[in-house]
A protein has these predicted regions:
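Amide-donor transfer/coupling interface in amidating biosynthetic enzymes
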Residues: 10-174
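Glycine-rich nucleophile elbow surrounding the catalytic serine of serine-hydrolase chemistry
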Residues: 1-7
Length: 174
């Protein structure tokens, strides 16, 4: 999703994504930008203790080879730079910087390269899969889930026939 919204917002620029990041199975703290909380709504209501924890503790679970290098935002007049504000970045195991958290400047579009849901829903514990399960990791996961649901509630669109759209009407194939 994160990579897709960058490609969609960036237009035909194929240099938005690169697939040489070494950040699979890699929990990281977020390197917040200077104005991360001052503009927009994504981080505005986050508690100070959680914000601080996200900046120093290894809470965000990264699972990607492809990503958006920070250099994709170097041209301040590019489509991607005019569409998104970078809220946080990271570096992979080799020191290569990538964009990790964005918020749309004009539209309620948000993206996170990491997987905050893994802390609450994946309980594998091993050196190979070091998913953080600390209280701050759980709070981070819940914060972003609550934020997303609250943003969805702002949409006044409704289904004409809600029953026909329920997941129970579809037979999953495994």
């Amino acid at each position: 999703g994160f990579e897709f919204i960058h490609v969609m917002a960036g237009g035909p620029d194929l240099n938005i994504l690169t697939c040489d990041f070494d950040s699979e199975d890699l929990p990281l703290p977020l390197n917040f930008t200077r104005n991360a909380r001052q503009s927009g709504s994504l981080l505005h209501s986050m508690s100070d203790p959680l914000y601080k924890a996200l900046s120093v503790e290894y809470l965000t679970q990264n699972e990607h080879k492809c990503g958006v290098p920070t250099s994709a935002y170097d041209d301040s007049s590019s489509k991607i730079s005019t569409f998104f504000d970078i809220k946080a970045t990271n570096v992979d195991r080799n020191g290569k910087p990538f964009v990790s958290l964005v918020e749309g400047k004009l539209y309620p579009v948000y993206g996170m390269q990491a997987h905050p849901e893994k802390s609450n829903f994946e309980w594998v514990t091993s050196e190979k899969y070091p998913i953080p399960h600390t209280i701050h990791a759980m709070e981070m996961s819940q914060y972003f889930a609550n934020f997303f649901v609250n943003e969805c509630r702002r949409n006044s669109q409704t289904l004409k026939n809600e029953t026909s759209a329920l997941m129970y009407n579809y037979n999953p194939t495994y």
